[in-house]
């Protein structure tokens, strides 16, 4: 599984904590969700389960499928449906010696929700959140 191929080498850097944020796309293989959750639960110190192109499926149902796998993997986790809030949470709880992996979006700059593509550039979101964090600005995350 590709998530395992990323998390395993990241462990070699010996981070204080490895925080893995991801979601699974809707209207795709539901069987992979539990497996990806299991991998993250086993290899990451904290899994942040979030939304990633739910398409016409319920984001909450997708996240519950992932949660089942994380629990079986013995992992600590939190579920935050809003991808922006999830990224903010992952970065806010991270320390200097942690690694935060945001998996899934890559080059995509949108969220596909109920047939509509909503603009969402994670790189810009991360830049803004880190600038706020470095400036000491604290925002409340709804989780």
What is the role of each PLM region?
Residues 1-143:
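ATP-dependent carboxylate-amine ligase
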């Amino acid at each position: 599984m590709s998530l395992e191929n990323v998390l395993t080498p990241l462990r070699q850097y010996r981070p204080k904590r490895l925080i893995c944020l991801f979601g699974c796309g809707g209207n795709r293989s539901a069987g992979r969700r539990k497996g990806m959750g299991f991998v993250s639960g086993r290899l990451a110190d904290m899994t942040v389960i979030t939304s990633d192109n739910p398409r016409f499926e319920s984001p909450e149902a997708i996240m519950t499928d992932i949660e089942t796998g994380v629990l079986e993997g013995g992992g600590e986790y939190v579920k935050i449906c809003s991808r922006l809030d999830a990224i903010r949470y992952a970065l806010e709880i991270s320390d200097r010696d942690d690694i935060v992996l945001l998996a899934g979006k890559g080059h995509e700059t949108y969220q596909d929700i109920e047939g509509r593509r909503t603009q969402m550039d994670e790189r810009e979101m991360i830049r803004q959140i880190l600038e706020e964090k470095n400036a000491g600005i604290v925002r409340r995350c709804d989780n």
